[in-house]
Amino acid sequence: EIPLRLVGSEMCIRDSLYFDKKATDSYDEPVSLSSSLLPLEKIYGYDPDEGIAPEDRRYLLGVQANLWTEFIRTEGRASFQLLPRIYALAEIAWSPVERKSWREFSEVRLPAHLARIDASGEPYRLPAPLGIEDGTSEGESFSFVIRPPFPGCKVRYTLNGAVPQDFDREMPEKFDIAVPRGEQRTLRCVTIAPSGRRSTVTTLVLTNRMQTNNPE
């Protein structure tokens, strides 16, 4: 039982509010003290009142995030870990849980925040392309609906496993790919912001395990 009866408290939960954690499993994530992941949606979804009796919630004064700096040696890296996570933390503090909407936050307010940060030159974490995730998938054909995290960003991709560069093909919003029988394609994509800032690389391995028909 959380001892909130005697003193006011600020909540900082390890699973949801330790901002030194990595956001994804991508190989190009910075080194972190923790091996667990903290995506933005998990931060936004945290409810400080959960598990606390209604009569005790008046002792909860606010929410707090921690940033452990054993592997964070520059102000720029600290800014990268904090932005845009700090906006999700703010909404935890001032929005009743029944009024929170991840979709509204991620599709309306977050893009506006990201555009302002990018224009300011402040270091921040640029989200990877929306509509595709790291992993593996099997089949003959695959379809994706891809969105950049905010207007003005480009999504570049490769199909040979190489890290996408500025000169690689731009991924359209509706993206279809067919994989020949018995073959595999390594789809990699990255967001590139107007400032030139890049997201981590998303890698999806697509495999068609159907065998080719051998002529008799």
Region annotations inferred by a language model:
Residues 1, 72-75, 166:
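A generic structural signal for short coil/turn motifs at secondary-structure boundaries
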Residues 20-141, 149-153:
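Substrate-binding clefts and catalytic carboxylate motifs of secreted carbohydrate-active enzymes
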Residues 100, 106-216:
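Short, compositionally stereotyped local motifs that mark structural "simplifiers"
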